Structure formats: structure tokens, C-alpha cells
A protein has these predicted regions:
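Bacterial N-terminal signal peptides that target proteins for export
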Residues: 2-15
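C-terminal motif of bacterial Sec signal peptides marking the signal peptidase cleavage site
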Residues: 23-26
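Bacterial signal peptide processing site
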Residues: 28-32
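A short, Gly/Thr-enriched small/hydrophobic beta-strand-prone motif that recurs across taxa
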Residues: 33-52, 173-186
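A short beta-turn/strand-edge loop motif at beta-sheet boundaries
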Residues: 55-61, 190-196
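Tryptophan-paired
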Residues: 65-119, 194-319
Length: 366
């Protein structure tokens, strides 16, 4: 090999080595992440542990996710909806394709088979509200007579989407906005109860939610029992022929939207015991607050009428975790209420069960 050819070969190898070294320096973090190139990847995960078990139930409960990325002016710069089996797989994350910057992450999630909620298509954050579909009554109120989809809301503000190569992962916490209320009426006399005899309802004003999950002004909405059944349980006792050995009951199920502290009775809210208690700005007037009502259709009389939020919060003291009242309501999603009826279908006692906790009240007015 001539001198010129030797110098050319050495120069070519040196140039290749320099290019290779520059490439390694530019992609060292990517190699660390195992990507093999200089790309930037954004991934968003979702977590639903705002429950009384303090365990992430996202994979088990959530079937559909719609994610919005919002810029500093509240404009939607990117959105995507994903649903199906992929959400239930371990490690699920939504891939996000957006320019580097700072964004707020907003999510509406849940099940979608019933079409219970409507979220408008919009490029503005303030219009990404959620409305519970309802029947319109002739009196200007709404009625929900069927079970509805589960609904979850998530918000993660002011997140930086970096421009340095690598994988960026963000986790959006979710709050569940739907609650199941199961009511059991029991008869002490052993008389069989007909499910058609009783009406169950919960009037409320919680059918519209803003982008930040706060309630918007709404028409009165009445939740009706979407399932009722008569049931009997008991055992025959030959040695006690006159004893009541069976329990007859009517079981009803209702589903409501988000429970809020604003529906707590003012008399309970007042800490000073002043009379009358001062109404807070966020509160509703007493006559418009959420109540569970059971009516005897045969007589037209009200069997039971209780402030649902008040009774739910009575159980809060049983839990040994520090949380405010709204967090407690958000963590609850199922209420089991048992009402024992005596003579004349008047309630004798009532209990509310939440997980393993039980509170019992006696009707001292009978």
C-alpha cells in the first residue's frame, strides 16, 4: 500500500470513530432506557385508589378512558380515547404524541355500555363538562329510572413534557363519581312484602359536573330504584310454632352521581349549635338537599326519609385514617341500608353498612 493510500485509510477510520463517538454521546440516556434511538416518548397511566380499600382498582373497574392535554390557555392540544381489554392489562399506559411543553391532563373515564353521560366535543377546557342523561318530566325536573355507567374524573395540572430524549411517565389519579345505594325493608311481623307496594327515590341536584369535577347548577333530578325484588329468608322451628321464623323483605337498588358535602344538613354542619345555623355559600337550601325516601304506595305515607349524606358521614368516625368529609364521600361508592318495619309499616330501626362497619339507629318517635 502506498503512503497516500495508507493516510487515506487512516483518515477514513478516524472520521468513522469520531462520528460513532458523537452518536454515543448524544444518545447515552436513550441507551440507558433501552430505546436504541434519540426519541422522546410520553406515557400516561391512570390510578384509581381513591376508595376505602386504598388499593388501585383501575384495571378492574375502568373500561374506557378519554384523555385531554390542555395548554396554559385552557385549549385542548391533544386528546385520545382508548377502551377495551387493553385497559385491564398490567402496566397499561396511553402513548401521547405532543410537542414538548407544559400541560394540564384532564380525564373522563368509566364504562360506556349504557351511554349514561354526555361530554361535548370541544377545544376549550371550560366546555369539557359531563352531564348525566335523564328523562324530562312535565314539571321541569329530570328522572333517572335505570342503572347508569360508572364515571371517573381525573386531573393532573402543570406537568412538564421534556424535550430531552427518554421516556416520561405521568400518573393521573381518578375519583369515582357514581354510587350504588341498596335498601332492604324488613317486616318484623312475618307478613310478606310486595315489591310493588313501595317506591324508592333520591331527589338531588348533582347531574352536571364541571371540568374540575365540581357540581354545576342543574335542574332537580330524581333517582328511582332501577331494581326491586321481594325476598324471604328463614327456618322452621317445630318447637315454637307461634314464633316468627322468617324474614320477609323488599330489596331495592338505586345509582346516584357524586355525593357532596354541600348536601349535609345545616343543623349537622353547625359546630357552634347556634339556632338557626348559618348557611354556607356552597350549601343548598334544606328542601333541595339529597334525601333517600321510601313511600308506601298503598297508603300514600312516607315510610322513611333520611338525609343520605348525613348518615353516610356518621360512619366516617369508624375509620382510623385522616381525611376530610369530601374525601370520605369520594372514597365511598356503595351503601347498604337496612330498615326494619313494624306495625303499620312504620320503621322501628335502621342500619347502614359500609364494608365491615355498621351503624344502627332506633326510631324513638314511635
Amino acid at each position: 500500500m502506498g503512503t497516500s493510500s495508507y493516510i487515506y485509510a487512516i483518515g477514513k477510520r478516524t472520521l468513522a470513530a469520531i462520528v460513532c463517538a458523537l452518536t454515543l454521546l448524544g444518545c447515552d440516556s436513550v441507551i440507558y432506557d433501552g430505546e436504541g434511538d434519540c426519541s422522546v416518548n410520553y406515557r400516561v397511566k391512570f390510578r384509581y385508589d381513591m376508595n376505602l380499600k386504598f388499593a388501585d382498582a383501575f384495571a378492574r373497574e375502568v373500561e374506557s378512558v378519554t384523555l385531554y392535554l390542555l395548554d396554559g390557555g385552557g385549549r385542548v392540544v391533544w386528546q385520545r380515547t382508548e377502551s377495551g381489554e387493553a385497559l385491564g392489562k398490567e402496566g397499561y399506559a396511553m402513548e401521547v404524541d405532543v410537542a414538548p411543553g407544559t400541560y394540564d391532563l384532564l380525564a373522563w373515564c368509566g364504562s360506556t355500555d349504557k351511554g349514561s353521560f354526555r361530554i361535548p366535543e370541544s377545544a376549550s377546557r371550560k366546555e369539557l363538562t359531563c352531564t348525566l342523561m335523564r328523562e324530562s318530566g312535565t314539571d321541569g325536573t329530570g328522572h333517572i329510572r335505570e342503572d347508569h355507567d360508572r364515571l371517573y374524573h381525573g386531573y393532573l395540572p402543570n406537568q412538564t413534557f421534556g424535550d430531552t430524549e427518554g421516556i416520561y411517565t405521568y400518573v393521573v389519579p381518578l375519583v369515582k363519581n357514581t354510587n350504588n345505594v341498596r335498601v332492604v325493608l324488613q317486616q318484623t311481623s312475618g307478613e310478606r312484602l310486595d315489591k310493588k307496594r313501595f317506591s324508592f327515590r333520591i331527589p338531588a341536584e348533582n347531574g352536571r359536573m364541571d371540568w374540575d369535577n365540581q357540581l354545576l347548577p342543574d335542574e332537580p333530578v330524581t333517582y328511582h330504584a332501577w331494581h326491586k325484588q321481594s325476598a324471604t329468608a328463614g327456618t322452621a322451628l317445630p318447637d315454637l310454632p307461634d314464633a316468627v321464623t322468617s324474614v320477609n323483605a323488599v330489596i331495592a337498588e338505586l345509582t346516584t352521581a357524586r355525593l357532596m358535602v354541600r348536601d349535609k344538613s345545616a343543623t349537622v354542619r353547625s359546630e357552634t349549635g347556634t339556632n338557626p345555623p348559618q348557611l354556607q355559600p356552597e350549601e343548598l337550601p334544606e328542601e333541595r338537599k339529597m334525601r333517600l325516601t321510601v313511600r308506601d304506595n298503598d297508603t300514600g305515607k312516607t315510610v322513611l326519609s333520611i338525609p343520605l349524606v348525613d348518615y353516610a358521614l356518621l360512619v366516617k368516625g369508624e375509620y382510623r385514617r385522616d381525611m376530610d368529609e369530601q374525601e370520605f364521600l369520594d372514597r365511598m361508592d356503595e351503601y347498604n341500608i337496612v330498615c326494619v318495619l313494624g306495625e303499620g309499616m312504620r320503621w322501628v330501626s335502621m342500619s347502614i353498612n359500609i364494608h365491615s362497619w355498621k351503624m344502627v339507629w332506633q326510631n324513638t318517635g314511635i
